[in-house]
Amino acid sequence: MRSPLMILAVLCVFFCAAAAGSSVTAEEKLVPGSQVACEVKVKSGGKDVTMRYWRFVPKGYNGKKSFPLMLFLHGAGERGDNLEVVKKWGPPKLVRKRKDFPFVVISPQCPRGTWWKVEGLYQLVNHVAGSLRIDRQRMYVTGLSMGGFGSWHLMDRYPKLFAAGVPICGGGKADSAKNLVGIPIWAFHGDADGVVKADLSRVMIKEIEKAGGKKARLTLYPGVGHNSWSRAYANEDVYKWLLSHKSGGGKTGGGRK
């Protein structure tokens, strides 16, 4: 007769192995045309942080052809630990019906009470680009409200990371314009936005142009308040415009100090 300790040891080995196996499956198993919850360890503010995110892989992905990548950054209202709320707006909402959406979409969640940390986002992009067949010359960033600010900041900090960006109802630092002159940017804002003033987008485009940039543009929606993202993300021309841009090699190493 086996001792209780031996039985306990065998059970521990079995369940630990099963748990490890399920973890690997959740992260590595790909179901084209679906959006799955994932997580990755990143360094942020000198600490190890677990970043949770949605990962959408389009129908037709088979690991042979490289696909464009889109990073989506949500607004302040979707922060927290309930990943489902990230699918409320934008690309993660869109792909629930658009199984053939022509991008791999990654939609991380920002913890409650914090703001987007670009170092962690940079690591997330590199993690996904290194684990899937991603066209590194076609990586894009977009976000709304707080995510619009995050998009501007990320492009400023890592100007060679993305081929183009679509910041919506956000804003950046005017003195960062010199770092953005080479990036195609299509910003959107409602001119009646009472939460994030449209002047924040106007100033960024103006400063980029003053610095010599010719690739930035702004669409203002007359009479529209803070929610300019519903119109922007419903515009098919946005996705065609993104796909029309390629970076000069998709270099992801190192950012601006």
Predicted regions and their residues:
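A domain-start/cap signature at the N-terminus of enzymes
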Residues: 21-69, 142-144, 149, 154, ...
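Active-site machinery of serine-nucleophile hydrolases
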Residues: 69, 73-123
